[in-house]
C-alpha cells in the first residue's frame, strides 16, 4: 500500500503549484530519496531539511513544506530512518549517517545557501532534530523539535506499559485515576 501511495503522490506532484523534484542520492549500495521544492523568486534560499516520525512519511508533509516555502526557504522533505523509503533501520546505532548524507548533498547544490541550513523533525523524528542540533551544530543554524518524545518516552518503565496497555490508558490510570 505504501509503494502505491508513493506512486500516486508523485503522479499528483506534477500538478502542484510549486514544482516538486524527486531527489535520489546514492547511499551504501541503496539510495536516499527526498522531495525538493524551491521558493519562487528567491535566489540562494536557505534550506529546511524536514521529516516526520515513525508513521509519518515524506509524502505526508506537504502542509509543512508549503509553510516553509512561504517564508522564502527551500523545503527538502525526507524519511527518517526506519520509515518510508529510508533504507536504514531506526534501531541502527549509526542511523544518523543518513542525515549527514543529506547535509552533504545540500552543499553540492549551488542554488542553495548552504550556510543557512535548518532541520525540523516531527513526532519521533524530533529526536533526530535534537540530536543533530548537537552532532551537526557546526553545519546547521537551527533545529525544530516538533512534538517529540521527552522524559517518559525513552524510559523502559513507561514504554513497556505504553506498548502493552496503550499509552493513553496507562497515563490516564496512573496520573488521573481513570
Predicted regions and their residues:
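Short beta-strand element of the alpha/beta-hydrolase
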Residues: 44-53
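N-terminal cap/lid segment of alpha/beta-hydrolase-fold proteins
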Residues: 2-43
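Conserved alpha/beta-hydrolase
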Residues: 68-85
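Alpha/beta-hydrolase active-site loop
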Residues: 60, 67, 90-112
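Residue in the alpha/beta-hydrolase core beta-strand immediately N-terminal to the catalytic nucleophile
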Residues: 79, 116-118, 142-144
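Hydrolase active-site cap/lid region
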Residues: 134-178
Amino acid at each position: 500500500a505504501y509503494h502505491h501511495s508513493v506512486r500516486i503522490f508523485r503522479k499528483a506532484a506534477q500538478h502542484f503549484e510549486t514544482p516538486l523534484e524527486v531527489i535520489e542520492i546514492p547511499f551504501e549500495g541503496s539510495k536516499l530519496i527526498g522531495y525538493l521544492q524551491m521558493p519562487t523568486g528567491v535566489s540562494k534560499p536557505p534550506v529546511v531539511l524536514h521529516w516526520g516520525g515513525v508513521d509519518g512519511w515524506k509524502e505526508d508533509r506537504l502542509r509543512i513544506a508549503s509553510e516553509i516555502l512561504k517564508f522564502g526557504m527551500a523545503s527538502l522533505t525526507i524519511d527518517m530512518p526506519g520509515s518510508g523509503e529510508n533504507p536504514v533501520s531506526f534501531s541502527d546505532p549509526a542511523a544518523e549517517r543518513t542525515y549527514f548524507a543529506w547535509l552533504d548533498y545540500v552543499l553540492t547544490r549551488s542554488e542553495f545557501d548552504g550556510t543557512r541550513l535548518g532541520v525540523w523533525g516531527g513526532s519521533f523524528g524530533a529526536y533526530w532534530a535534537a540530536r543533530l542540533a548537537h552532532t551537526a551544530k557546526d553545519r546547521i543554524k537551527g533545529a525544530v523539535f516538533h512534538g517529540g518524545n521527552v522524559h517518559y518516552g525513552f524510559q523502559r518503565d513507561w514504554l513497556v506499559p505504553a506498548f502493552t496497555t496503550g499509552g493513553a490508558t496507562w497515563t490516564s490510570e496512573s496520573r488521573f485515576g481513570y
